[in-house]
Amino acid sequence: MPLNEIVGVVGNLISKGYIKKQSVIDALMSVPRHKFLPKNMEEYAYIDSPLGIGCGQTISAIHMVGIMCEELDLNMGQNVLEVGTGSGYQAAVVSKIVGESGKVTTVERIPELFEKSKQVLSELGYENVEAVLGDGTLGYLENSPYDRIYVTASGPNVPKALFEQLNDGGIILAPVGSHFQTLMRYKKTNGKIYEEKLLEVAFVPLIGENGF
């Protein structure tokens, strides 16, 4: 991995206040983003921008991955669900933060992206990540309940199934909206859901039974 490039990007995110937690900094520094991109896009891997990965999908900008990890308040040992694997990059970053005692289940609906991301995650040794082919808007009941759930595509609302599969005290992070989207954080406390608007964002549409 071109260390000087990722050091520059992460240093910039720290100086702008996007990322603060050492665990997030360490994870972003250690995951080789270029490995999750098509060969013809590898040279752009450490530009802090979303990039196309095929099938009409994108890999999120590095700052957005960092912000989401910060806002999820990730810690070692947590059980995490990712809705929308895409390239697999964000699942890899999250897996570094939750560590070997934690687990990341990531669900992708597009077979081509599922196969590619599963292969890369396996080759790079992310053993605490389980890749699943399916409709992420239904969650993934088999590995629930989850301490943290995050969605990497924007839907009209957060699917009910995700709240049902969330532990009490757990957090869901999801972009909501169509043309104008807001990154929302939901916390379940004593069975009640409390929501908070974080920032305006731009994600691909959430497709599925409980999406668009």
Curated annotation (Swiss-Prot):
Reaction catalyzed: [protein]-L-isoaspartate + S-adenosyl-L-methionine = [protein]-L-isoaspartate alpha-methyl ester + S-adenosyl-L-homocysteine
Active site: S60
Keywords, in A-Z order: Cytoplasm, Methyltransferase, S-adenosyl-L-methionine, Transferase
One matching Pfam family: PCMT
Record InterPro entries: PCMT, SAM-dependent_MTases_sf
Cellular component terms (Gene Ontology): cytoplasm
Enzyme class label: transferase
Record keyword Amino-acid biosynthesis present: no
Gene Ontology MF: a single term: protein-L-isoaspartate (D-aspartate) O-methyltransferase activity
GO BP annotations, alphabetical order: methylation; protein modification process; protein repair
Family membership: Belongs to the methyltransferase superfamily. L-isoaspartyl/D-aspartyl protein methyltransferase family.
Function summary: Catalyzes the methyl esterification of L-isoaspartyl residues in peptides and proteins that result from spontaneous decomposition of normal L-aspartyl and L-asparaginyl residues. It plays a role in the repair and/or degradation of damaged proteins.
Record protein name field: Protein-L-isoaspartate O-methyltransferase
Gene label: pcm
